[in-house]
């Protein structure tokens, strides 16, 4: 009995012991959906207002923790076995009682000392949380299409730049290192998500049609007058807008990072070497050839190429901002003159009227996650529609991969047909209605009901309009220590855009090819009225930077994804999301697995080189006409599970790189 009483006394006191008290004042560990090392988020001075919120204030949490552990009444204390309280049986004024009273005073001193010690430890812990140095290095990841640009993004993060600072520098770097895919003379779209505030913004800097552009001119001369294909570039305005909203380092410093790459030179990537050897613009000027083929022949991968002309442009933009690009200065005049000399109609007024748009992304819930993607004129709604349709199928590890591929192929036929009906909503109000239908779970169920489990549809379920998006695009994905997620995709449309190079070294885009007009393609696809040519309008786009977050709360999986390949990129993103969110595969495996794409114009189901003969035979037995190609698209990704972050490139890309801060 004495041993039991002693144990009971230890148990009762243990509730107030210093070690246990320290444990209850620690912040709760977030649940993880995959193994990951703990890495608490670092507090920032500019987040003080956010930390003052009752749901996130450490002081409030500590107070609530104490209140939960303190006994609610004296009777509760008295109910503890081995309590020091006893019934008084002697005269309290007697000598014996006085001796007992002295013993009780001693116990009070011990308990008081323990509580005082615990309080001191708690205060020290709180001071360490607020004022101490971080005990664990912050994590982050950067993924781009070129290893040198990934390294540049990491350098910006290491110098206390924000996630957007890193993305801007990396995107400008890609305009130097991958000029066939992106550049100052192009445009794009950036999606930014703030994890702590659970806020998302999309910055749309898609090119717009010149005010004097007419459909008739494109019909007659688009293939002989490359200047007609040039839209008003949005790259500089868009990146500057993103920096104004989320930048931490000075604008000039961010641009100086990229200018150094142009000035010092870079190693020619495999993809650029291939583009210069196989995809040289037919109208390449002497200036173009002198810039990219300085030795008179395509450079080999790894050879050094310098762009001092672009370094000078970036220095000007760093000092003067976007005004030097858009407000009638030398850069503006050069771009206008170059396009007009090649038959274009773009003017200085078109440049001065251009603005980047800041808006909300479209979103849909899929398997407990919120999927965020760009709204029209981008095809984010079609991506979410594909996920909504697939959500109703029994896609588990128990279902054969071949059966799942059949469902995916039939679903993508519907999603791509829906995408062909989108365009710029500013010029057509019906596009908003179409978008709402694409985001509807009810509509998705209706479409799902038309998909056979055993047979490919002999004809498209919906009318299909012309689909011919930009085949090349550059990707930047950043998850920084500041708890921001950035996904960005930019493009010039065709390799090297229009092929027109200004004296300052700016390649001009060919984005007007993304509009639809009669007899635009060799197969004479029906033109889309929603995507017809109009002055100031932005064409249909398959640039789809995509962010995924938990549908409820802040704990769980976050993703940043991007893709190139136009419509094939939408197909690739759908399948990667399916692999990660439905089949619970890790990101590396999800990106590496074989992907398919239904080409609606040719009625061929294209599959990449990762497909086995057995899978192809299964699809053909279901009525699909299969065509095997080497690569359909590159899909890069970054994943965060609570505080564990990883950046992963598509293994199909020979030059891309993902880097992670450990």
UniProtKB/Swiss-Prot annotation:
Region of interest called Disordered, as start-end residue ranges on this chain: 26-90
Residues exposed to the Extracellular side: 128-662
PTM section of the record: Cleaved by autocatalysis into a large and a small subunit and the autocatalytic cleavage is essential to the functional activation of the enzyme.
EC number: 3.4.19.13, 2.3.2.2
Gene3D superfamilies listed in its UniProt record: 1.10.246.130, 3.60.20.40
Pathway where it operates: Sulfur metabolism; glutathione metabolism
Entry keywords, A to Z: Acyltransferase, Glutathione biosynthesis, Glycoprotein, Hydrolase, Membrane, Phosphoprotein, Signal-anchor, Transferase, Transmembrane, Transmembrane helix, Zymogen
Protein name, entry field: Glutathione hydrolase 7
Organism: Mus musculus (Mouse)
BP GO terms, sorted: glutathione biosynthetic process; glutathione catabolic process; negative regulation of response to oxidative stress
UniProt membrane topology term: Single-pass type II membrane protein
Originating gene: Ggt7
Glycosites: 198, 267, 283, 330, 353, 394, 519, 523, 586
